[in-house]
């Protein structure tokens, strides 16, 4: 008989004697206390046959540390200090006390002062009371016997002094099951060809199926948390009647990435420390319609046909031909708006969610590449109020409420607004997006009618993902430090539901 089978028989016999076992940790098996791990295997096996029923319990107990054991046996440090001072008759200075008690002197002296057992007289320590009661060893002895005491304040003090430590103990209570018996019947787990041939299966007993048991996790691929949140955003946009823009073009010319957006060619964002420039090929010969390029050039230099004055600086075609890794998906939005103007304007709503690249220092909240969520609304005679109203609807779908809007600056939007929401857990206002109305200097050279207004807004995909999945460092979400277990275990997400 194996040890497991012997333990099963032992438990059944104990149950037969008493009908119930309230606490398995009080049992002794094979000459020692029955531990929870050892008992669990036998209990689960018997419960699967409905021979017993059980409940699992967990309690907290306190054990003495090595120092606690020493004090329990030999008395507290403060009592030793008091006794040495009493024995000296005239008191002791600190140096003499350390020679007699060693490390106990420093620990015990402070406690003895606190309890009012000793006082200072000149450079000596003298007793302050004729007698003391050393309660600490008594309390520790009670904890050693019972695992705890009723006085929570004293228990907290002992924990702070590192005389006791808390442990969790698991135990089981057992009752007889519907199939209780002292004989353990072996149940079949498989229906074999031999059993079918001999018809022995008709009288055989089989182990019941456990339909609540977890199956083996599928070995297939898993969606990254970013992709799950991305699909939630796409759903919101489609519900609001938006059309998705094609964004499968990571490389853009300086024209679409900057110039078409009315970003000055002298802007710091166009420096190598902020933008990734391609080496091979370093530039492109493919620019849009020369007339459009000429209108953009004139708008930059002197305002062109718009009412503005431009940047009053030369416009370099060499600069506009440079190839970069796109720094924002607004380059795609500009291309779509240009096509909208060429094909005959009609009210439109576009969105995109894709990767962009910035030459930034990588840290816990910044990466050199990340995902931008962007939306554009074009119609006649729409205003900043329409933008604010739409943003309240859009962020409301993500359960982000209580918005505030702060004036901001963007080269291609005016007016521009930063969007803030009050974060209940952080207890402060946090930025959740950026927005604005595209400038006439961007729209009119495209050929859009003068009464057409375009509203734009954007946010990162990573920030809401980090909040929803409780990720503090963005490098744990994207890059070589990503834990594959995080991806496999990440649940489905609903941005419109509170956690």
From Swiss-Prot:
Mg(2+) binds at residue 414. One of its GO terms (cellular component) is cytosol. L-phenylalanine binds at residues 330, 372-374, 412, 438. It comes from the Eukaryota. Disulfide bonds: none annotated. GO terms for molecular function: ATP binding; magnesium ion binding; phenylalanine-tRNA ligase activity; tRNA binding. The keyword S-adenosyl-L-methionine does not apply. This is Phenylalanine--tRNA ligase alpha subunit. The gene is frs2.
């Amino acid at each position: 008989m194996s040890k497991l089978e012997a333990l099963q028989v032992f438990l059944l016999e104990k149950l037969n004697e008493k009908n119930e076992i309230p606490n398995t940790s009080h049992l002794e098996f094979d000459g020692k206390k029955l531990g929870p791990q050892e008992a669990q295997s036998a209990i689960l096996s018997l419960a699967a046959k409905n021979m017993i029923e059980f409940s699992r319990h967990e309690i907290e107990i306190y054990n003495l540390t090595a120092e606690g054991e020493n004090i329990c046996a030999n008395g507290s440090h403060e009592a030793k200090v008091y006794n040495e001072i009493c024995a000296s008759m005239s008191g002791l200075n600190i140096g003499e006390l350390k020679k007699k008690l060693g490390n106990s002197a420093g620990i015990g002296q402070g406690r003895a002062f606190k309890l009012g057992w000793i006082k200072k007289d000149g450079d000596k320590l003298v007793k302050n009371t004729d007698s003391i009661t050393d309660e600490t060893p008594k309390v520790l002895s009670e904890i050693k016997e019972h695992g705890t005491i009723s006085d929570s304040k004293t228990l907290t003090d002992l924990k702070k002094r590192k005389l006791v430590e808390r442990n969790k103990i698991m135990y089981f209570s057992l009752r007889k099951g519907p199939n209780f018996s002292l004989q353990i019947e072996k149940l079949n787990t498989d229906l074999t060809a031999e059993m079918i041939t001999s018809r022995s299966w008709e009288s055989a007993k089989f182990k019941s199926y456990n339909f609540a048991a977890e199956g083996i996790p599928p070995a297939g691929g898993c969606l990254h948390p970013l992709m799950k949140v991305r699909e939630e955003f796409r759903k919101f946009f489609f519900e609001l009647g938006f059309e998705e823009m094609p964004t499968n073009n990571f490389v853009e010319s300086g024209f679409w990435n900057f110039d078409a957006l009315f970003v000055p060619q002298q802007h710091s964002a166009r420096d190598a420390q902020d933008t990734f420039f391609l080496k091979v090929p370093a530039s492109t010969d493919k620019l849009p319609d020369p007339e459009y390029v000429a209108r953009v050039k004139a708008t930059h230099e002197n305002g062109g046909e718009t009412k503005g004055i431009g940047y009053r600086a030369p416009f370099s075609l060499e600069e506009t031909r440079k190839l970069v890794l796109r720094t924002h998906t607004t380059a795609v939005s500009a291309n779509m708006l240009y096509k909208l103007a060429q094909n005959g304007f009609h009210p439109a709503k576009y969105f995109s969610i894709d990767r962009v690249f910035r030459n930034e220092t990588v840290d816990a909240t910044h990466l050199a590449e990340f995902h931008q969520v962007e939306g554009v609304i074009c119609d006649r005679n729409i205003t900043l109020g329409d933008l604010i109203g739409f943003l309240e609807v859009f962020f409301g779908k993500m359960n982000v409420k209580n918005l505030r809007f702060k004036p901001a600056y963007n080269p291609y939007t005016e007016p521009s607004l930063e969007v803030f929401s009050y974060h209940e857990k952080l207890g402060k206002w946090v930025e959740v997006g950026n927005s604005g109305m595209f400038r006439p200097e961007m729209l009119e050279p495209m050929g859009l009618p003068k009464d057409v207004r375009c509203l734009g807004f954007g946010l990162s995909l990573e920030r809401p993902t980090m909040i929803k999945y409780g990720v503090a460092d963005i490098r744990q979400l994207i890059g070589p430090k990503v834990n594959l277990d995080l991806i496999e275990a990440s649940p489905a997400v609903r941005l419109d539901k509170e956690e």
